[in-house]
Design a protein with these regions (language model features):
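Conserved alpha/beta-hydrolase catalytic His-Asp/Glu region
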Residues: 114-116, 131-185
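Conserved serine/cysteine hydrolase catalytic core
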Residues: 172-210, 219, 228-229
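Catalytic histidine-centered segment of alpha/beta-hydrolase-like enzymes
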Residues: 223-235
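Conserved HGGG/HGGXW glycine-rich cap/lid loop of the alpha/beta-hydrolase fold
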Residues: 4-50
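Gly/Ala-rich beta-loop-alpha elbow adjacent to hydrolase catalytic centers
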Residues: 80-89
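Alpha/beta-hydrolase fold catalytic core
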Residues: 1-15, 36-39, 157-161, 242-262
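Flexible "cap/lid" loop of the alpha/beta hydrolase fold
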Residues: 94-130
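Active-site loop/oxyanion-hole signature of alpha/beta-hydrolase fold enzymes
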Residues: 32, 41-78
Length: 262
């Protein structure tokens, strides 16, 4: 893995897990809006590190914990995981001994996919991500709902470093067709499983609710996958700050209102 930090190590720590096809630097726009109050840690998965070999989620978790210890981090104010980063974040949450105060999943890809299907997915995902490097980001609209210039550098960097073997190994132990790992009830109460109502991953929401009945489930009405984070990193950072400091979401105009029981 490769690690970047933003902010003062003496401040409360926020750990990010990035989405598929990008590097950890993709969290920089949000982290820079948090750096005055928090110490932000941005790992890049071994999958997107040139010269490194992905050895499994347990090894990724070990590397993250080793780095946190080297920085003197003894607890985490917040874990933020985007898309497939939710898969690794969940492994981290169930294995780490570090206290974690809050968790925010942004469009978590809580898919449970059979082994044979995951094997078929590998060449398609590999070519999609490599094409972003080869085309200098021009093919982004083919794999994403947007093609914002601001996010293209993260896809290009990931595509440049990606090797087929690492993609194959990651899909071997990610998005597995297994029950979701258990989370203590108290952890669930401070965990936000957010989905945009317009994103494909929204279809996983009900399954996640059944697995984690004490979690928080905000829905961003009309929003696409990670749209708030991508289009408004300052607003997204302010939302995360509210979660850490007040244990609640701020008023958001696109937040779906909960239906009251009759």
């Amino acid at each position: 893995m490769r690690f970047e930090t933003i902010g003062n190590p003496q401040n409360p720590a926020v750990l990010f897990f990035h989405a598929m096809g990008v590097t950890g630097a993709s969290s920089e726009p949000v982290a820079r809006n948090l750096q005055e109050r928090y110490f932000c840690i941005l790992p890049t998965s071994t999958v997107y590190c040139a010269g490194q070999t992905y050895a499994g989620k347990a090894d990724e978790v070990r590397q993250v914990e080793d780095f946190l210890r080297s920085c003197g981090v003894t607890r985490l104010a917040l874990v933020v995981a985007s898309s497939i980063g939710a898969d690794l974040a969940m492994a981290f949450l169930t294995q780490t001994q570090l206290p974690v105060e809050h968790v925010f999943f942004d469009g978590g890809q809580f898919a449970q996919i059979g082994k044979s299907i995951r094997r078929i997915m590998v060449p398609f995902l590999y070519l999609a991500i490599k094409s972003l490097y080869w085309s200098k980001g021009k093919t982004l609209k083919k794999v994403m709902w947007c093609d914002d210039e601001s996010i293209k550098p993260y896809f290009i960097a990931a595509g440049q470093a990606l090797r087929y073997g690492n993609m194959r190994r990651q899909l071997t132990d990610s998005l597995e067709d297994k029950p979701f790992p258990a989370l203590p009830d108290e952890v669930q109460k401070h965990t936000y499983f957010e989905f945009g109502s317009a994103e494909e991953h929204y279809k996983y929401c009900e399954a996640v609710k059944k697995a984690y009945p004490y979690g928080q489930y905000p829905v961003f009405e009309g929003y696409q996958h990670m749209q708030f984070q991508i289009r408004d990193p300052k607003g997204f950072a302010a939302m995360l700050t509210s979660i850490v400091e007040q244990d609640r979401l701020p008023e958001l105009p696109f937040l779906r209102k909960e239906k009251k029981a009759a």
